[in-house]
Regions:
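The beta1-alpha1 cofactor-binding region of Rossmann-like NAD(H)/NADP(H)-dependent oxidoreductases
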Residues: 53-65, 95
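Hydrophobic positions on the long internal alpha-helix
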Residues: 79, 112-116, 120, 159-160
Length: 227
């Protein structure tokens, strides 16, 4: 049994991560901004050991406070899942929304890793997973647009590469993981796969993450993505 911290766990991919990890016997620490309204998340408590905490990953004080609350708890796997989408085509780019997206999509995952590093060092699996997007690939950008989301994920990818080098000496492996185009609130109804298929694939990838396979930019089916 692994102890796994999942952010953004109240819906979509985060909720499905919690469900599938519990179903296989793991202990899950799930966070979201409003646990009081996360009925679907609370419904999963009958599946196994699940702890639910309030956390806005963009609020540094909340992140620091939660780490102090969980300071005694080894974390085997940290899954930075929380993220936001802000549409942005040329001529309609909001600087405020761009800054917000960088705060949540790019900076918050790195702050989570930095803050919970003592917990990860105490864990047995020692894995850090950041959910990104293929839209963060510079090589794969053949259509333009989506300036805010693309750049926020590209920044995350770059930071995760630095994290790879810094965490390897500590025995912690990293993975920057693309879930596919998923039918969720964020992905919309046109997605190619559902959350169950995406998360099932991602968990298989996560299980293979090791110091020998650290720092990969990879999708839910195990395909390497060009940076």
């Amino acid at each position: 049994m692994s102890q796994i911290l999942v952010t953004g766990a109240n819906r979509g991919l985060g909720l499905e991560f919690v469900r599938q990890f519990l179903n296989r016997g793991d202990h899950v620490i799930a966070t979201c901004r409003n646990p009081d309204t996360a009925d679907q998340l609370h419904d999963l408590q009958n599946l196994g050991p699940l702890e639910i905490y309030r956390l806005d990953v963009g609020n540094q004080d909340q992140v620091n406070a939660l780490q102090k609350q969980l300071a005694h708890l080894p974390i085997d796997i940290l899954i930075n899942n929380a993220g936001i989408w802000r549409g942005s085509q040329l001529g309609h780019i909001s600087i405020d929304e761009w800054m917000e997206s960088f705060r949540i999509n790019s900076i918050a995952p790195i702050h989570m890793i930095q803050t919970f590093l003592p917990n990860l060092e105490a864990g047995k699996d020692k894995k850090v997973i950041s959910i990104t997007s293929k839209m963060g690939s510079i090589d794969d950008n053949t259509s333009g647009g989506s300036y805010i989301y693309r750049s926020s994920k590209t920044a995350l990818n770059s930071a995760m590469q630095s994290m790879r080098h810094d965490l390897t000496p500590k025995g912690i492996a990293t993975c920057t993981l693309h879930p596919g185009w998923v039918r969720t609130d964020m992905g919309g109804p046109g997605g190619w796969i559902d959350a169950q298929e995406s998360v099932s694939g991602m968990i298989k990838v996560i299980d293979q993450v090791s110091l020998k396979k650290t720092g990969q930019y990879i999708d839910y089916a195990g395909k390497i993505i060009p940076w």
